[in-house]
Amino acid sequence: MENKGVITQIIGPVVDVTFENELPRIYNALKIDRGNGEYLVAEVQQHLGNSVVRAVAMDATDGLQRGMEVVDTGPAITVPVGKAVLGRILNVLGEPVDEAGEVKAEEYAPIHREAPAFEDQGTEKEVFETGIKVVDLLAPYVKGGKIGLFGGAGVGKTVLIMELINNIAQGHGGLSVFAGVGERTREGRDLYDEMLESGVLDKTSLVYGQMNEPPGARLRVGLTGLTMAENFRDKEGQDVLFFVDNIFRFTQAPSEVSALLGRMPSAVGYQPNLATDMGALQERITSTKTGSITSVQAVYVPADDLTDPAPATTFTHLDATTVLSRRIASLGIYPAVDPLDSTSTALEPQIIGHEHYNTAREVQQILQRYKELQDIIAILGMDELSDEDKVTVNRARKIERFFSQPFHVAEQFTGMDGKYVTVKETIRGFKEIIEGKHDDLPEQAFLYVGTIDEAIAKARELMKGAE
């Protein structure tokens, strides 16, 4: 027999329900009939006493009234998983929002589950080849790791995310799940259209909880996407890419309902269980013995304050950071990754090997020296530099340009064929530049090419054109 209750109080997205017979468990999904054939789903958060539970609605509470009937569905929110969700846009409840018919899934899974047990986790640190030179050389990603993508508006976060999705699909045959948490609806639509055009949509599942949706949806949509990714990892044995844009909104949503749930606010008005919420999501993103989930998370930094509790809590979980810089974007170098600001825990000789490590460190030293010399160059010009510094500056400028790379997903905008560069080729190219083997080549030859051989071929063409 169904366990039924009655709404006794509604405050914004928070609904109190009285159950006379049996109280639903914490995180159970409650169904409320709006009376027009539509149902509202709410998730139990607290037991208040006197047979009352407090729940957070996953959709707008407009039109609800006290006295309306509520049904305890039994389990937590369950969403479709498996191959059926590929190529689809779903909402927090796993319902399709792309007008392409119902999702014919053979399996459903609850969005709340424990992180993999300690003995099930993979312990080897394995580098994840992205095919993007600047990332693979200086801030390599770890399989089953978490990567923070920091960048302002218009510096290329979305294009970088799309290229990663493309390279995983083409290069590794892997699957991706994209969770748009508190996304602009327009950006979500753009991403869908671009994926459709570039042909990576059938290897991707999109889960959106947009900015205009109530906090309940933004609070749980990350877990919905993660549940789908976990299924690909555990049942299909896949190496999955899990994108979250934006992880900050995942911490912002509970802070909106925290006071309504009767919790005392903590620092800067955030919810007191901020670290617990974040840990529950992040600890599920890991490698197991069957497969891995590698997560790329766009991080919005409120007022550029990295000590704000939301980004600070995110930092503790990250294995690598990829920082996009407006200065580099303004030079026309894309991807606009800042080579000196981006970091990775995998940049260790015992993980990536001595050749890769030494090349990366030398590249950073040259770029750091170039940065120090820029004031002198701006005031006095190149002629005032020592011969040694002139060589360093020339090599640094070539390295900067060699970091640029044509992307597959931007082919229709740039007119250039996208390039996937293996780690081996990347190391060889930068090593040759550092060793001075290409000091005679013009800077332009290094702009928007793949391997060093392409740069040499481009230099020959430039020289022919000059003649």
Curated annotation (Swiss-Prot):
ATP binds at residues 151-158. Produces ATP from ADP in the presence of a sodium ion gradient across the membrane. The beta chain is the catalytic subunit. PANTHER family: ATP SYNTHASE, ATP SYNTHASE SUBUNIT BETA, MITOCHONDRIAL. Pfam families: ATP-synt_ab (PF00006), ATP-synt_ab_N (PF02874), ATP-synt_VA_C (PF22919). It is a peripheral membrane protein. Keywords: ATP synthesis, ATP-binding, Cell membrane, CF(1), Ion transport, Membrane, Nucleotide-binding, Sodium, Sodium transport, Translocase, Transport. It is an enzyme of class 7 (translocase). It is found in: Cell membrane. It comes from Propionigenium modestum. One of its GO terms (cellular component) is proton-transporting ATP synthase complex. Belongs to the ATPase alpha/beta chains family. InterPro entries: AAA+_ATPase, ATP-synt_VA_C, ATP_synth_F1_bsu, ATPase_a/bsu_AS, ATPase_alpha/beta_chains, ATPase_F1/V1/A1_a/bsu_N, ATPase_F1/V1/A1_a/bsu_N_sf, ATPase_F1/V1/A1_a/bsu_nucl-bd. Coiled coil: none annotated. The lineage of its organism: Bacteria, Fusobacteriati, Fusobacteriota, Fusobacteriia, Fusobacteriales. F-type ATPases have 2 components, CF(1) - the catalytic core - and CF(0) - the membrane proton channel. CF(1) has five subunits: alpha(3), beta(3), gamma(1), delta(1), epsilon(1). CF(0) has three main subunits: a, b and c. The ATPase of P.modestum is of special interest because it uses sodium ions instead of protons as the physiological coupling ion. It catalyses: 4 Na(+)(in) + ATP + H2O = 4 Na(+)(out) + ADP + phosphate + H(+). GO terms for molecular function: ATP binding; ATP hydrolysis activity; proton-transporting ATP synthase activity, rotational mechanism; sodium-transporting ATPase activity, rotational mechanism. This is ATP synthase subunit beta, sodium ion specific. Its EC number is 7.2.2.1.
